[in-house]
């Protein structure tokens, strides 16, 4: 039997009393652990105006986490298009896809 393909969705939660910088470091380590465990994908979700979530700059996080991992595919689980110019989103993720 073929094992299931596993993926993870991360909102990059900021722990109570923690900082955004700590949450971002934990996200990198989480992606690296997921990679070590054989996960195929690591998804990041975009959220704004929520002090407990640090994933507002999704394209930046995708690039940062992809640069800290080797084999896991890193991507966006959602972009809030009303908050962005569609061409900018297409160019940012098109560039990330080529890196």
Predicted regions, residues:
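Active-site-adjacent segment of SDR/Rossmann-fold oxidoreductases
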Residues: 98-99
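N-terminal beta1-alpha1-beta2 module of alpha/beta enzyme domains
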Residues: 1-74
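Glycine-rich anion/phosphate-binding loops
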Residues: 21-26, 82-95
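The substrate-binding groove and active-site-proximal loops of carbohydrate-active enzymes
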Residues: 75-83
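Glycine-rich, flexible loop/turn motifs
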Residues: 68, 77, 95
């Amino acid at each position: 039997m073929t094992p299931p393909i596993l993926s993870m969705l991360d909102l990059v939660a900021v722990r109570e009393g923690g900082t955004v910088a700590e949450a971002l470091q934990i996200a990198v380590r989480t992606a690296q652990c997921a990679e070590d465990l054989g996960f195929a994908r690591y998804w990041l979700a975009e959220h704004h105006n929520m002090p407990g979530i640090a994933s507002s700059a999704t394209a930046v996080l995708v690039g940062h986490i992809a640069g800290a991992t080797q084999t896991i595919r890193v991507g966006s689980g959602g972009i809030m298009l009303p908050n962005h110019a569609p061409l900018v989103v297409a160019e940012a993720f098109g560039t990330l896809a080529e890196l």
